[in-house]
Swiss-Prot record:
It catalyses: tRNA(Gly) + glycine + ATP = glycyl-tRNA(Gly) + AMP + diphosphate. Its EC number is 6.1.1.14. This is Glycine--tRNA ligase beta subunit. Coiled coil: none annotated. The keyword Lipid biosynthesis does not apply. InterPro entries: Gly-tRNA-synth_bsu, Gly-tRNA-synth_heterodimer. One of its GO terms (biological process) is glycyl-tRNA aminoacylation. The lineage of its organism: Bacteria, Bacillati, Cyanobacteriota, Cyanophyceae, Acaryochloridales. Keywords: Aminoacyl-tRNA synthetase, ATP-binding, Cytoplasm, Ligase, Nucleotide-binding, Protein biosynthesis.
Length: 712
């Protein structure tokens, strides 16, 4: 067994690409080696801003020989009068064997020729020499560039290549912007701390050799070092570090030899909102903020991660202190200047901000958000006070976009709106809604907690969805430039989390009609929006609510045919899906599945409308020939109030109890001593019996379409 090393040395790589490349190689390379019969005992992928590396231990020196059986032509086509035909000769030539190697064997289709063909395994060095370039250039990332005259693309120019199998060099040549890069044993140390070339004698020496050259190649080790140093620096200034996982991941891939350096600034800057200070530190400067040991009060300190000389930490600290002072001084100026007038007076300036080229300004969007918010408030039957709060919050929700602070720090939209609203004397409910209406900002982000914030958030996203759909810019595949999937997901999650009794279908109809009146040349189709929300419902129910796919189909329809019903009552759709999952788990579904499903399948041969529940008027007892029909009919009469109660109160337990109780009667109807032939020759008898089955199907349909459910 051998140890294999590949190191690709480059110009400074973007941190996001290094992290992505490591994940890609961790996924792809083990599969590639296994496919080529060179599975190692262990494989690690390393990465820094200047290199990507693979270290595989326990790699076979050579592929194993492989013997495969190849089926040839029929014997009667391969031989004529005992002599090989051209077909036999061609097959032998193609497989690299001789006629004497043929084996005749009987099969179900007659006698055929077979040969045993052995392929000799290649040395690992030769296989790796072919694979390595494909691994390098299969990496994907943003803004790749061509670094030579050919089609070769990579994130940054490749400067060196180390490729070893034990102490043997694997010969590789790559075309690059500076010519041809040939593999050798020479790597590079830290650009500042160890600029001299580094020789790698054996792959097993790689990590230790680079560490001596001030490069920690293992990102997990670098991250551990960073966390330890950051905590130590914070403790030294009697505070605790605020470590964001995103920032920690980013700085891990920005440095090769991390050194945490603490810096400070004047306490007067702490009068700024904490969000302004931390945004400048984290998003712009990649600093870790420092808080008081107890509570969340910021201290006038920060911690930066240097990739330079630890001996020069004082100089590094001073330089960063100058930067943060200047940035926070700008923040002080913006904060004071923005409060020179009330937040509401910024509204006219929104005319200068374009929402979308064909859709006008953000000021016009605000008017649409207000209208949407009032429709939501009306549906929820809110009192006048809360409705007025909703209207005012919707009016002010985008006003901070034209403040100087948000112009400098776009990440603070909504946050500064809340601060400025309070400073302007707006009620807390309105100020909070301004910041909350942007929530959630991502898949795992928190949701708005106040009713006003929830309503304005829904109204804003409804406008975005209807407007962009009106332009025909419907998301396709992975392309979703306006984040419409995220917007629809947010609406559904807000409704579910807050248990808002909303008719989303009606809201889509109202907002679409209003949009069409405002923009006559753009006509969004409500059905397209329904279908889109149906896709999001399906995804959320399966992926986040962990509902089985067939139970989701039972609620939405296998082709989305029940989506509109769910949009009319989104809470009910979720509750039905969850209840179906519950009764599958506890076994209740199995007790009614066969009966209901059989009835539903046969009922398709009838013409009873799916919303009919009362047997009176659609079933004629005078036509009954067997007692099982009467018992079935009586069971439906008993089931009716239980189903109606389930519809009005969403108490589907009563419905399932009723279906469980009627199941034996239906089984008797089908298979008992007094069973009947449903598809009778007499048309009236046939229709009467199909209506009985159709009624049972309809009662079950109140919970879900049992025809879509797969038997457990």
């Amino acid at each position: 067994m051998a140890t294999f090393l590949l190191e690709v040395g480059t110009e400074e790589l973007p941190a996001s690409f290094v992290e992505s490349a490591i994940q890609q190689w961790r996924s792809h390379i083990p599969n590639s080696l296994e496919e080529h019969l060179l599975t190692p005992q262990s494989l690690k992928v390393y990465g820094t801003p200047r290199r990507l590396a693979i270290l595989a231990e326990g790699l076979p020196d050579q592929q194993p020989d492989q013997t495969v059986e190849v089926k040839g032509p029929p014997a009667k086509a391969a031989f004529k009068d005992g002599k090989p035909t051209k077909a036999a000769e061609g097959f032998a030539r193609k497989q690299g064997v001789e006629i004497k190697d043929f084996e005749l064997r009987d099969t179900e289709k007659g006698e055929f020729i077979f040969v045993q063909k052995t392929t000799l395994g290649k040395p690992a060095v030769d296989v790796l020499a072919d694979l390595i370039p494909t691994w390098i250039f299969s990496l994907e990332g943003k803004r790749f560039m061509r670094w030579s005259d050919g089609e070769v693309k990579f994130s940054r120019p490749i400067r060196w290549l180390v490729s070893l199998l034990d102490d043997h060099l694997i010969p590789i040549k790559l075309e690059n912007s500076t010519g041809t890069i040939s593999s050798d044993r020479t790597s590079s140390g830290h650009r500042v701390l160890h600029p001299d070339p580094v020789t790698i004698k054996h792959p097993q020496d790689y990590v230790a050799t680079l560490e001596k050259a001030s490069v920690q190649v293992d990102p997990e080790q670098r991250q551990t070092l960073i966390k330890e140093q950051v905590h130590a620096c914070a403790k030294a200034v009697k505070g605790k570090a605020v470590i964001s996982e995103d920032l920690l991941a980013e700085v891990t891939y920005l440095v090769e030899w991390p050194t945490a350096v603490v810096g400070g600034f004047e306490s007067e800057f702490l009068e700024l909102p904490a969000e302004v200070i931390t945004t400048e530190m984290v998003s712009h400067q990649r600093y870790f903020p420092v808080e008081a040991p107890k509570g969340a009060k910021l201290l006038p300190h920060f911690i930066t991660i240097s990739n330079g000389d630890p001996a020069k930490s004082d100089i590094i600290s001073s330089g960063n202190e100058r930067v943060i002072r200047a940035r926070l001084a700008d923040g002080q100026f913006f904060y004071k200047a923005d409060q020179a007038m009330p937040l509401a007076e910024y509204l006219p300036k929104l005319e200068t901000v374009t929402f979308q080229e064909d859709l006008g300004s953000v000021r016009a969007k605000v008017d649409r958000i207000q209208a949407n918010a009032l429709w939501v408030a009306k549906q929820l039957q809110l009192d006048q006070k809360v409705t007025q709060q909703v209207e005012r919050a919707a009016q002010l929700c985008k006003a901070d976009l034209v403040t100087q602070m948000v112009g400098e720090f776009p990440e603070l939209q909504g946050v500064m709106g809340e601060k400025y609203a309070i400073a302007s004397g707006e009620p807390t409910e309105i100020a909070t809604a301004i910041v909350e209406h942007y929530l959630p900002k991502g898949a795992n982000d928190q949701l708005p907690q106040t009713l006003v914030g929830q309503i304005v958030g829904i109204a804003d996203r409804l406008d975005t969805l209807v407007s962009i759909f009106g332009l025909g810019m419907i998301p396709t595949g992975s392309s979703d430039p306006f984040a419409l999937r995220r917007a629809a997901n947010a609406i559904l999650n807000i409704v579910w989390a807050a248990n808002l009794d909303l008719n989303l279908d009606q809201l889509l109809t109202e907002t679409t009609a209003a949009f069409a009146q405002t923009f006559a040349k753009f006509q969004p189709e409500v059905q397209q929006l329904r279908d889109f929300f149906g896709q999001r419902l399906r995804s959320l129910l399966q992926d986040e609510q962990t509902i089985d796919y067939d139970l989701v189909n039972a609620v939405l329809g296998e082709k989305g045919e029940h989506t509109q019903r769910v949009l009319v009552d989104v809470l009910d759709g979720r509750d039905r899906a969850q209840y179906l999952q519950t009764i599958r788990t506890n076994g209740t579904l199995d007790t009614i599945y066969e009966t209901v499903n059989r009835a539903a399948r046969l009922a398709t041969k009838g013409d009873l409308a799916s919303d009919v529940l009362d047997p009176k008027g659609v079933v004629q007892p005078k036509l009954f020939e067997q007692s099982s029909e009467q018992v079935f009919y009586d069971g439906l009469l008993t089931l009716l109030p239980q189903t109606q109660a389930a519809q009005s109160s969403r108490d589907y337990q009563k419905l399932v109890q009723g279906l469980t109780k009627i199941a034996p009667s239906v089984s008797q109807f089908f298979d008992g001593d007094d069973s009947v032939l449903v598809i009778a020759e007499d048309a009236d008898l046939r229709a009467n019996r199909l209506n009985l089955l159709g009624l049972l199907r309809n009662h079950a349909l109140v919970l879900g379409d049992f025809g879509a459910i797969v038997k457990s």
